[in-house]
Regions:
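Conserved N-terminal entry element of GNAT/NAT acetyltransferase domains
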Residues: 1-37, 186-199
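Acetyl-CoA-dependent GNAT
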Residues: 44-104, 108, 113
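Conserved short alpha-helix immediately C-terminal to the canonical SAM/SAH-binding motif I
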Residues: 125, 149-152
């Protein structure tokens, strides 16, 4: 990351985090170690459809040297790791993502533990996080979800995300791709090409 972007990112993080949502729920930037610890604890329970194939695992292990180089290079791009805390400052969820290209932020994964689902935490988190990403300078946000994941799809569609594709992923299954455009010129271009109406 260049110095100007890094400075913009530092200033945006100071401006937006930590932040308290309703009902004493707090969101904050996490270190890699903090984030990984929470994901390791809850990921399999929240995403049981994520399958690990032993043959693929062995193949990736054999290709490990080159994969490590790619992973290291990928980590140099802008990424965000955010943890969600309850009123006792215990982690109850996360959000992560990163640059997909120079205009697009990819919301990679969000998880909220079962006992805190259905409390509008995701909707509040989405609203605030998108303001933050726009402040950094991104033009659009994408994400992918299973078609049965109504708890995420419905809030995003209500917010203004559009369905823009489908990926048949070897690990995750059939994933619906969503896109959100921050600016009306991009949204208008999208609707004029693909929408049921022009705006």
């Amino acid at each position: 990351m260049n110095d100007t972007f890094q400075m913009n990112l530092v200033n945006s993080r100071k401006k937006f985090f930590p932040f308290q949502l309703q009902n004493n729920i707090t969101i904050n930037i996490a270190t890699n170690e903090e984030f990984q610890s929470v994901c390791n604890k809850y990921f399999d329970d929240l995403f049981p459809n994520h399958t690990k194939d032993s043959e693929l695992e062995r193949g990736m292990e054999a290709r490990n040297d080159k994969l490590k180089l790619l992973i290291k290079n990928y980590q140099d791009f802008h990424s965000e790791k955010i943890l969600i805390y309850n009123e006792n400052h215990l982690p109850i969820g996360w959000l992560c993502g990163g640059s997909n290209d120079s205009h697009t932020f990819y919301m990679r994964n969000t998880g909220i533990i079962n006992s805190y689902q259905g409390r509008k935490i995701y909707t509040q988190l989405l609203n605030y996080f998108l303001d933050y990403i726009k402040n950094i300078g991104y033009e659009r946000v994408t994400s992918q979800h299973l078609g049965t994941n109504k708890g995420v799809l419905i809030p995003k569609l209500k917010y203004g995300f559009e369905i823009c594709g489908l990926e048949l992923h070897e690990n995750y299954g059939a994933m619906i791709k969503l896109v959100y455009h921050f600016h009306i010129d991009r949204k208008r271009l999208y609707y004029n090409k693909y929408g049921h109406m022009k705006i």
